[in-house]
Amino acid sequence: MLLVTGVTYASLKTRTKAVDNFFKGACVNIGIVEKNKNKEMILEDSGTGKDGAYNESMENNSNVYERISENMRTTAKEVAVKNITSQDYPTTDTVVRVRFVPVLVYDDNEQNKKDNIAGQTVPLDMRGKVDYILADGVVAEASSQETEAKWIYKDSLSGDINDRYYYYISALEPGEVSEMLLKEVTYNGELPENTHFELRVLAEGIAKAQLPYLV
């Protein structure tokens, strides 16, 4: 059995790198779409060639946000998912889910480079330290009776909101962009010196045609 899937991610301060799949006839290629400060829709990573392969030498759009600090704990983070298709790399209807992964990262400065920790993740438990302001009217708990919801979620057994998966209720057609999922993120934990907060948005996709084979 062959499952055609794709994964992509985006974070507050880094560019997205899509993981693409090269199976003709049922390709999956998804990307994170975000609103910038001018409320323009930006595909977080445009660095793919005509064949859909990621190419670091190509120009990339990296959406940079206001940095969370002791004095500013909330920042805008408006995200959606796009089914990226092209004539040379046609995709199929894709079912997607998203998870938020908050982390603290050591700054890329001289001191951290000297200590050989620049860019590394700070080992810190993020449970109870992050709040997400979800898009108005389109996100609902799976068991609710909300009929207008485009995204649904079910809390995990751990009770940690960072373990949630958000599922788009309809498959994205080639070229289609989902409704916005997230508006803002707030971090209420500690910020050690020479570190910064990042929210990594992980998106996974599977070809709609493969769903009947999942048990």
Model region roles, listed by residue range:
Residues 1-215:
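Long, small/polar-residue-biased beta-strand-and-loop interaction regions
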